[in-house]
């Protein structure tokens, strides 16, 4: 029998490697940026902001996986990573019309306008007026860039995420993308009790805390983050050889035999968490 403490020790080494991958990615993104990059340098500035947000989400997912009881949140955060990847893919895709700079603006302006519509009823202590002023300033600056660059085309919205991920799912090693994205809604919206919990007698088993689930979600997180990072890097400089090296590090972690053994339910019988009713 493998004790829970031993299993956690095995997980720690994998989580540390996954976290280190994000530092490698951010370092390379910084290296690939235009040295004179400012808020209005497109697509570089837009790529930088989107990848920074995705990195924060990714690290949050790894952090949640370190504690069995909170690991369910990693699957919820995976949804954000896949959506960030879809936006980066849109910017990279010449078939979407215009140049990359304008596609980056189509995403940024679209997201900015869509986000402003969700702030309806705010808590009394939140200065909604000040937020809206800052938001409007940003939108005006983006609109100036749009006009200056002579951009055209439909703005990207949240409704475009699914179709983009469907296209990504037709590529080698990415067939899981669209299905996983759809399934994450079960944890985001908290209706997936059929696979998250299992009741036995007077106790409820936390299925999501099983090693196999945590290992599987780790593999999805690393894959999504690695692929979205590569997409961002290639937008900045497609020919840099370090991108291939980064890709190999991400692939090596996903294909790590230990990770696959854990995902294959090797330790599930030795590790169960129950909440007494």
Show which residues each predicted segment covers.
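A cross-kingdom marker of C-terminal helix-rich interaction/assembly modules
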Residues: 1-277
């Amino acid at each position: 029998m493998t004790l829970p403490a031993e299993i956690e020790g095995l997980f720690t080494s994998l989580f540390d490697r996954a976290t280190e991958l994000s530092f490698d990615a951010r370092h390379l993104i910084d290296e690939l940026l235009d040295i004179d990059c400012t808020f209005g340098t497109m697509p570089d500035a837009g790529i930088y902001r989107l990848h920074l947000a995705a990195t924060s989400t990714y690290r949050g997912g790894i952090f949640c996986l370190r504690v069995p009881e909170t690991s369910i949140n990693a699957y919820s955060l995976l949804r954000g990573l896949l959506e960030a990847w879809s936006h980066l893919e849109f910017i990279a895709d010449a078939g979407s019309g215009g140049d990359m700079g304008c596609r980056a603006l189509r995403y940024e302006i679209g997201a900015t306008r869509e986000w402003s519509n969700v702030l309806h009823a705010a808590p009394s202590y939140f200065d909604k007026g000040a937020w809206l002023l800052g938001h409007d300033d940003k939108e005006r600056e983006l609109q100036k860039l749009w006009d200056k660059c002579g951009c055209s085309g439909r703005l990207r919205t949240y409704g475009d995420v699914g179709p983009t991920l469907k296209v990504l799912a037709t590529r080698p090693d990415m067939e899981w993308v669209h299905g996983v994205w759809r399934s994450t809604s079960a944890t985001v919206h908290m209706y997936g009790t059929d696979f998250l919990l299992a009741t036995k007698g007077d106790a409820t088993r936390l299925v999501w805390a099983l090693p196999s689930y945590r290992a599987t979600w780790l593999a999805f997180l690393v894959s999504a983050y690695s692929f979205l990072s590569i997409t961002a890097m290639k937008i900045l400089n497609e020919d840099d050889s370090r991108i291939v090296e980064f890709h190999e590090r991400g692939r090596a972690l996903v294909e790590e035999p230990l990770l696959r053994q854990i995902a294959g339910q090797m330790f599930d019988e030795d590790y169960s968490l129950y909440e007494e009713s």
